[in-house]
Design a protein with these regions (language model features):
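Bacterial N-terminal signal peptides
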Residues: 1-9
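Acidic, Gly/Ser/Thr-rich repeat motifs that build Ca2+-stabilized beta-propeller blades
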Residues: 10-170, 210-234, 287-323, 327, ...
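Surface-exposed loop and turn segments in beta-propeller and other repeat-based domains
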Residues: 72-87, 132-148, 182, 187, ...
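Beta-propeller blade signature
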Residues: 117-125, 175-191, 241
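Beta-propeller blade termini and top-face loops
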Residues: 163-167, 174, 179, 188, ...
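Short, contiguous, pocket-lining structural segments
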Residues: 174-182, 199-207, 212, 229
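Beta-propeller fold recognition
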Residues: 235, 239, 243-258
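Conserved blade-ending motifs and adjacent loop-strand segments that build the rim/top face
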Residues: 328-349
């Protein structure tokens, strides 16, 4: 599998046996926007609404203008990274003031396996400037090639990112529950500082490969949605206010989904006071293996999905949605849309939602 990532519309360990597809005529389709080399993320840049950036795992960022791919990549750091399996160039983020500063950030694994976040500057709207690289964060990831995390997201001036627990099975070093380790965490950093120092924001995560902020459900109280990849039994969705997530413990490796974790290297006691997922689903559902966390849709041109959370599973391939609540979820549905090996969702500056397939295609969710 590319990613070792890892909940149901309920607040208990019970998992629904099946979900119901959306009825015909509810109006969601897929529009193919291009084909790329192992695309793993899609993003827009504030101030440039006609541009769309596609991250390729091998180390390049492609740019589309007005829906058309440009010939030269926006960025090529293939010489700086290790790629393959769960490693590679994994995401890109543009700050709110990008049009003025031209600074942007990428998350990747280097040849030694370390997790790195670097800053670059763009010389034009469609090309990064050579020689502009500045190291922001480096986190040792010395033993295993999996569970690297990979997401970057801005909320205000803070750059948030999620790290995996260091890999293997059951988090043998207990990184996720150790507040002094930077693995198995949601972290944030102020990249404007001269020497940026990452802060632990939340602990107890296994591999939060994709997370997002929900600013549409309650604009005054932004919420955080984390697709945290499970190990043997369950995939989970964590959803809470950003304020409540600060200092929160999401439970791994004492818990997997709603249940005590009982696989390899189990035995970590439940620390108590953990934030439980709002939704979990078993690997027995359609051959599932790894949640691909998405977005709470803010695009009003998609009324069938407006304020609903969209997500998928790497192995199952079905696109699904649900209504997230702070203490549960409701209305979990198949969208009647399936793609091979979904690797990520993405969002542009107009809140339009995209989904990438590791096989190459990238699609936009459109009304129909």
């Amino acid at each position: 599998l590319l990613l070792a990532l890892a909940l149901p519309a309920c607040g208990s360990a019970d998992v629904p046996e099946a979900t119901t597809p959306l009825k015909r005529g509810t109006g969601v389709g897929l529009k193919r926007i291009g084909s790329f080399e192992a695309p793993v993320y899609v993003a827009g840049a504030p101030g440039f609404p006609k541009l769309l950036f596609v991250v390729e795992q091998g180390g390049t960022v492609r740019v589309l203008r007005g829906g058309h791919e440009l010939g030269r990549p926006f960025l090529d750091i293939s010489g700086l990274i290790s790629s393959g399996g769960e490693r590679g160039l994994l995401s890109i983020a543009f700050p709110p003031d990008y049009r003025r500063t031209r600074r942007f950030y990428v998350y990747y694994t280097d040849p030694a396996g370390n997790i790195r976040i670097d800053e670059f500057k763009s010389r034009s709207a469609t090309r990064a400037a050579r020689g502009s690289r500045r190291a922001i964060v480096q986190i040792p990831h010395p033993v295993n090639a999996n569970h690297n995390g990979g997401q970057l997201q801005f909320l205000g001036d803070w750059l948030y990112f999620g790290t995996g627990d260091g890999g293997s099975g059951g988090d043998p070093p207990n990184n996720a529950q150790n507040p002094h380790k930077l693995l198995g965490k949601l972290l944030r950093v102020d990249p404007r500082e001269l020497r940026p120092d990452p802060q632990v924001f939340s602990i107890g995560l296994r591999n939060p490969f994709r997370f997002s902020f929900d600013t549409v459900t309650d604009p005054g109280r932004p919420r955080l949605a984390i697709g945290d990849v499970g190990q043997d039994e369950f995939e989970e969705l964590d959803y809470t206010t950003v304020a409540a997530a600060h200092g929160a413990n999401f439970g791994w490796d004492a818990l997997e989904g709603f249940a005590p974790y009982r696989g390899a290297n189990s035995g970590t006691p439940d620390p108590g006071g953990t934030v439980k997922p709002i939704f979990a689903y078993p690997h027995s559902r359609g051959g599932s293996c790894s949640i691909i966390g998405g977005y709470v849709v803010a695009d009003r041109h998609l009324p069938a999905l407006y304020k609903r959370y969209v997500y998928a599973d790497l192995c199952e391939g079905e696109l699904r949605s649900l209504v997230p609540h702070l203490h549960g979820a409701s209305g979990e549905h198949k969208l009647g849309l399936r793609i091979d090996t979904p690797s990520s969702f993405g969002e542009d500056t107009r809140s339009r939602v995209y989904v990438a397939s590791l096989e190459g295609p990238v699609y936009r969710l459109v009304p129909r």
